[in-house]
Design a protein with these regions (language model features):
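Juxtamembrane transmembrane-helix boundary signature
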Residues: 77-82
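Hydrophobic alpha-helical transmembrane segments
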Residues: 1-76, 91-100, 105-245
Length: 245
């Protein structure tokens, strides 16, 4: 049931988990890297098919753009929303209380719009770099897994900005056992991808530390939106590193 809960939360795949309010949602975090690998496997498969088609010759950037759209579609844009909200809240000179209010505001501000555009452009360019060689495609499987593993670490280690927010809800039941399962899963996935799989496993937690420490400094802790921003920053940083090495 925890596995189905993770699939239902992190993707738009048509699963119907049996929700049990007595089961702490944090237990599902043990499967986050596995779901990330599922997302990445779909993306790698689509990328392989695109590279074998006539699309790269007809429109070189189109396969990468379609893959980025598929990435957002599979996840339902869940983490992109958190990234945009965090850009609006974290980069304006206001009080901690005002930042938390901005996170609740459903409207997209200028910082959020620019931040979202920059993130997607960088991600698009990195995907284009990875799709230059079939040997790099396994990285697409590891990147989403490593980013969600980094999220599990952040949720376990860093404090919450609100004791009753969404982040607090999803962290309930997250313990050392879940972190250990997520870590072993992420390491195995990276190892199966070869030496290039190590790159996301190193870069994703570093990106997580940057976002988490910024959130602690300006919000007092992590929120549900920060969780999403961590995933997006970790994915993007890992993609950039993977396409440069």
């Amino acid at each position: 049931m925890d596995l189905l809960r993770a699939i239902g939360l992190l993707t738009v795949l048509p699963v119907r988990p049996r929700w049990d309010e007595r089961t702490a949602p944090g237990r599902a975090m043990a499967f986050y890297p596995l779901i990330g690998a599922l997302i990445g496997g779909i993306l790698a498969g689509l990328a392989f098919l695109a590279m074998k088609s006539r699309l790269p010759a007809m429109a070189p950037l189109l396969p990468s753009a379609l893959l980025l759209a598929a990435w957002a579609g599979i996840t339902g844009g869940l983490h992109l929303d958190g990234w945009a909200d965090c850009c609006d809240a974290l980069f304006v000179p206001v009080t901690r209380e005002r930042r938390l209010e901005i996170l609740h505001d459903p409207r997209l501000g200028s910082f959020g719009g620019v931040g979202l555009a920059v993130l997607l452009l960088v991600k698009l360019a990195a995907i284009q770099g990875i799709m230059t060689s079939p040997a790099r495609l396994p990285v697409l499987i590891v990147v989403p897994a490593a980013a969600r593993w980094a999220l599990v670490i952040a949720a376990r280690v860093f404090p919450l900005a609100r004791p009753d927010g969404m982040a607090a809800h999803f962290r309930q039941g997250l313990g050392a056992r879940e972190v250990a399962i997520a870590t072993v899963t992420a390491v195995v996935i990276a190892a199966l991808a070869g030496w290039r799989g190590i790159i996301p496993l190193v870069v994703a937690p570093l990106a997580m530390l940057v976002m988490a420490r910024l959130a602690v400094a300006r919000l007092g802790g992590l929120t549900g939106d920060v969780y999403g921003a961590i995933v997006e920053l970790a994915e993007t940083a890992a993609l950039v590193a993977a396409c440069l090495i």
